[in-house]
UniProtKB/Swiss-Prot annotation:
Subcellular localization(s) per the UniProt record: Nucleus
Name of the protein in its database record: AT-rich interactive domain-containing protein cfi-1
Entry superkingdom: Eukaryota
GO biological process: cell fate commitment; cell fate specification; negative regulation of transcription by RNA polymerase II; neuron differentiation; neuron fate specification; positive regulation of transcription by RNA polymerase II; regulation of transcription by RNA polymerase II
Tissue note: Present in IL2 and URA neurons, and in AVD and PVC interneurons. Present in muscles from head and pharynx (at protein level).
Primary role: Transcription factor. Regulates neuronal subtype identity. Involved in motor neuron fate determination and maintenance, acting as a transcriptional repressor to counteract gene activation by transcription factor unc-3 in a subset of motor neurons. Probably acts by binding to specific promoter elements. Promotes differentiation of URA sensory neurons and prevents them from expressing male-specific CEM neuronal features. Promotes differentiation of AVD and PVC interneurons and their glutamate receptor expression.
All copies of domain REKLES, residue ranges: 356-464
Amino acid sequence: MSVRIDEPQLFVSMSKEPTQETVNVGGHHDDSSSNCDERVDDQTEEQKSPPASPDLTANLNVFDLESRQKVVQRLLNSQLNLSNLRAPLNLPPIFQALQGPFSIQQQLLGLASGLTAISPGLDDYDEENTNQGEPEDLTLGGFRKETSVKSEEPSESGINASGPAWSYEEQFKQLYELSDDVKRKEWLDDWLNFMHRIGKPVTRIPIMAKQVLDLYELYRLVVQHGGLVEIINKKLWREITKGLNLPSSITSAAFTLRTQYQKYLYDYECEKEKLSNQSDLQQAIDGNRREAPGRRTAPSFPLPFQLPHAASAAATMLNNQLNGLGMRNDLLDDENTLSLQASGLFGTSYGAEQMAILEAHQRNLERAQRAVQQQVARQSLGLTACSNGNGGNIHNSGRESTSSNDSDIPAKRPKLENDVKTNGASSMRISTKHSDNSKTSMSVSMEINGITYQGVLFALDETVSES
């Protein structure tokens, strides 16, 4: 194959090995390369090559081309392993390489970038592939930019929507369409602007009983009844619930309405109506918390005055069961503990307005307890006097009588031991007798409250007692 340069017709034979290259001057060349010459001539005519250069310049270009072709040939044979590739036509190695993969073409074009003046088709191919890649990248980048711009447009509109200049009716459409009241739109616009101005912008609509809570109607009803503080003090939430057409089965409807009103509408009420302030609201909430029905464990009517008498009657009944003398200190302590627990329970349950009545009842209860204790003390003094009067008879029995008092109660009723010891006011008769043998025995007979107890006591040996 030969490459035609221009006038004067210079041909470079590239069909032989690079070492056997020859330069022919003239208008004739081999027939085997005529087709390639015609193809190259067509390319040169399409690219409109510059005018012919002088002979010296043409020779220099030819030798420059040969040196670059040698470099390309070595690259293809050694590094790219293309020595075995065969083209359909006997093309030069540089054209054979251009028919290979695109990555190889890029490397080859990078090395042969200086051949643009001689083979203009290479630059066209390079620009064509470059132009094929760039629009795809640009299209992808443009698509990403367009999608990012489209995604940013709603956020920008949302930012504008949060501003006071944006129409609230589009964002809170449900509130505006709850009724046909002509003042609704005006009030909602003014309220939403006010909340935005004080730094508490409304971001959502409260829901109650699976429906939108009509804040406009809630505000109107509360103001008609005197404001939030008045509603809390007078407990008028049932009327508010009926006015809002909420179902009566809602649990804690009063608490929910109060919290929603306090969050969304109370600041607006203080600004426009000036019916109360934050301190009044806090006092009303605290008072309502103290009087909350869930915190009451007793009825709201005053305590009956029969409570001290009932306590004294219970004490009298215990006194009768224990013969009027056996009121132990532990029972009195239990009674005091119960009374204190009851008073503490009532004190936590009742409000401040009932504490005075409770204290009066507690004082009456304490007086009744003191009366019971004094009665027990007087009976104890009488018991001591009786025991002193019978001391001679008991003392005559000596050690045996003492041991009899310690062991005259059966084992089944050990708790009555103290009662028997102190029960000297009842009739008691003790008779003893001794047996004939050396061991002394004593027959004891006692009558207590009409019941006679009788038994025989034996003296213990000293050896047995020591063991």
